[in-house]
Amino acid sequence: VGTGPFRLTQFTAELVRLESHDYYHLRHPLLKAVEYWITPPLFEKDLGTSCQHPVQITIGKPEDLPLVSQVSSGISLGFCYLTLRKSSRLTLWQARKVITIIHQSGLLQTLEVGENLITASNALLPGWTIPQWEVPDEVKLPETLTLAYHLPVELHAMAEQLRTTLAAEGCELKIIFHHAKNWDDTTPLAQADLMMGDRLIGEAPEYTLEQWLRCDPLWPHVFTASTYAHLHSTLDAVQLMPDEENRHNALKAVFTQLMDNATLTPLFNYHYRISAPPGVNGVRLTPRGWFEFTEAWLPTPSQ
């Protein structure tokens, strides 16, 4: 926020206000300002919105709510994910079994979250598909595993469903909840075998994922020190490739290996929806999952 035709003028827990630049050098938006009020109690009962992950946005005033209808929708590139740390407690095939259970048991389709809020992931990014394995019958899960996870709130349902599902496989899942939107130094990640969170994706998906591997405090707890150092060396080599397509293909290979090694799997993406009362025009959702207001316009107020 702060680039393009709008600049950020106010940012609080309840309000984000954008105003158009007076001297923007390209096409000017039709609206002078856009205010985004974060008011989950206003919509939560009827629309099922999550105050931690606002996937439903309604344009208008509270008195307009009975009149609103959907004007734009899409599926996020961002995703909630599961990472797995292999060790003497969790082998490669045991980790693959956990992932197979998640994606093939119907677990993701039966989560107790809002209707049409999420869709089960089949790829990390479009074309970066999740691998599938034939897990040998003799592979049994450990007696206990520990899961750490943070917000959004939809992961509460995921954690409980996973605990129930793994219990049917003879595995007790101990759960640690980190009440924040990101990992930090206070998270007991060193105790966890499994870790869940979410990864927002911006206008440059490949760059976002590359920086995620480099910078998120999660990864030093997923890999051994030597493996993580080797990963950084691989990312350095990828970054030096002069051709963009080659860089993207090389980064895809890195993440494909992480998924095949049962280190990472996406869980689900979000359905984003914009609703508005009659007369609100031109608001759309971009292919990247961003809300576009530059062509939005309102009719002249009635006298």
Where do the protein language model's features map onto the residues?
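Extended ligand-binding regions for polar small-molecule ligands
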Residues: K86-Q109, Y228-H248
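Bilobed periplasmic-binding protein-like "clamshell/Venus-flytrap" ligand-binding domains
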Residues: E138-Y149, M241-P278
